[in-house]
Amino acid sequence: MCRHVAWLGAPRSLADLVLDPPQGLLVQSYAPRRQKHGLMNADGWGAGFFDDEGVARRWRSDKPLWGDASFASVAPALRSRCVLAAVRSATIGMPIEPSASAPFSDGQWLLSHNGLVDRGVLPLTGAAESTVDSAIVAALIFSRGLDALGATIAEVGELDPNARLNILAANGSRLLATTWGDTLSVLHRPDGVVLASEPYDDDPGWSDIPDRHLVDVRDAHVVVTPL
């Protein structure tokens, strides 16, 4: 399991999104409020953003977010219109390595998977960045295309009825997300939109997304449809 968050809007620093909120990913790495599976997220973290040329950049680690002084020192200076970050709680038996931490990428999209799926139902692919289930799910989604995200998640969910398949993806101008077994909330701000596993503050504007839904964010417009 993990906790993830994404931003699409006016330029925002990674510190402002990930480290500074009173219940942001930094706090969620050791004291999440809404996490249904696992007690903390200390098995790695990752942050990705799109630079001014639209190139996806990533920083991933297999260490707890709270112990990364280097990231804390540069995060205030890293600003982007589109950011995706996650903290990881590794499934028992899965490797703990930087390549197992989200966000995964195909060069155009950044993607995080919050959940669990039986790797036996997933097609084997050499494109996966790690042997963990999340990396294989990401590779499958990339191969099918993000426009088919809803159909892909519904198919995997049918193959593994116990799967939890909360996906969060970003390409610099669009956010996509699914709810399938875990929580997701949305916050509309005057300068952009946040999608997050759980609210990172007590702003009354947060709204919960129902389970088994697809979320599509473009140009500050949020469309939510059933899966």
UniProtKB/Swiss-Prot annotation:
InterPro entries documented for this protein: EgtC, EgtC-like, EgtC_Actinobacteria, Gamma-glu_amide_hydrolase, GATase_2_dom, Ntn_hydrolases_N
GO biological-process terms attached to the record: ergothioneine biosynthesis from histidine via gamma-glutamyl-hercynylcysteine sulfoxide
Domain of life (superkingdom): Bacteria
Enzyme class (EC, first level): hydrolase
Keywords, comma-separated and alphabetical: Glutamine amidotransferase, Hydrolase
Active site: C2 (nucleophile)
Biochemical pathway: Amino-acid biosynthesis; ergothioneine biosynthesis
The Glutamine amidotransferase type-2 domain, residue ranges: 2-227
Reactions mediated catalytically: gamma-L-glutamyl-hercynylcysteine S-oxide + H2O = S-(hercyn-2-yl)-L-cysteine S-oxide + L-glutamate
Job of this protein: Catalyzes the hydrolysis of the gamma-glutamyl amide bond of hercynyl-gamma-L-glutamyl-L-cysteine sulfoxide to produce hercynylcysteine sulfoxide, a step in the biosynthesis pathway of ergothioneine.
NCBIfam families found in the cross-reference section: ergothioneine biosynthesis protein EgtC
Name of the protein in question: Gamma-glutamyl-hercynylcysteine sulfoxide hydrolase
Species name: Mycolicibacterium smegmatis (strain ATCC 700084 / mc(2)155)
Lineage of producing organism: Bacteria, Bacillati, Actinomycetota, Actinomycetes, Mycobacteriales
